[in-house]
Amino acid sequence: MTKKEQALIEQYAKSLVEVASEHHSLDTLQADVLAILETFETTNLDQSLSSLAVPHAEKIKLLTLLERNNSVYMNNFLNLILQNEREAYLYQMLQAVLNEIAIVSNQYNVTVTSSLPLTEEQKSRVRAVVAKKFAVTAGRLIEKVDPSLIGGFIISVNNKVIDTSIRRQLQAFKMNLK
């Protein structure tokens, strides 16, 4: 992806988030974006929209199907994308919208990797740790299970990491012995 394309994607995303923020609809916009991204991930919609073999009329039909359950702002955004023939960048734009929402609302996705699935109490404690240590609000809590950690957990938020895993501690101990 070129710098020009990246700038275009970011500008579309920033504009959509700005409009939603002005109208106090960030939560609605975020729900719409997550629903559409889920559709992208369960289908090959991204390939269809970026393919030159698929006629523009077919792309219009595909995006019209996405408009049914969305807010006015998302529907206007999708129409603008169609009007300017930027469908090929829609997936990246939606990802950028989520990033912009996170920046504006200071609410980031939290990835927690542990050796066992977390209980509800542990999840709430993770949210508290994130709020205290990173000074951000926890958005979605993405839970991963990795038995190789042996114990402890790894919390990752906005490119910052807390690693209390036994595996890392054993590696550090091994390095100290050398």
From Swiss-Prot:
This is ATP synthase subunit delta. The keyword Transport applies. It comes from Streptococcus pyogenes serotype M4 (strain MGAS10750). GO terms for molecular function: proton-transporting ATP synthase activity, rotational mechanism. GO terms for cellular component: plasma membrane; proton-transporting ATP synthase complex. The lineage of its organism: Bacteria, Bacillati, Bacillota, Bacilli, Lactobacillales. PANTHER family: ATP SYNTHASE DELTA CHAIN. It is found in: Cell membrane. Pfam families: OSCP (PF00213). F-type ATPases have 2 components, F(1) - the catalytic core - and F(0) - the membrane proton channel. F(1) has five subunits: alpha(3), beta(3), gamma(1), delta(1), epsilon(1). F(0) has three main subunits: a(1), b(2) and c(10-14). The alpha and beta chains form an alternating ring which encloses part of the gamma chain. F(1) is attached to F(0) by a central stalk formed by the gamma and epsilon chains, while a peripheral stalk is formed by the delta and b chains. It is a peripheral membrane protein. It comes from the Bacteria. InterPro entries: ATP_synth_OSCP/delta_N_sf (IPR026015), ATPase_OSCP/dsu (IPR000711). Keywords: ATP synthesis, Cell membrane, CF(1), Hydrogen ion transport, Ion transport, Membrane, Transport. Gene3D superfamilies: N-terminal domain of the delta subunit of the F1F0-ATP synthase. The keyword Cytoplasm does not apply. Belongs to the ATPase delta chain family.
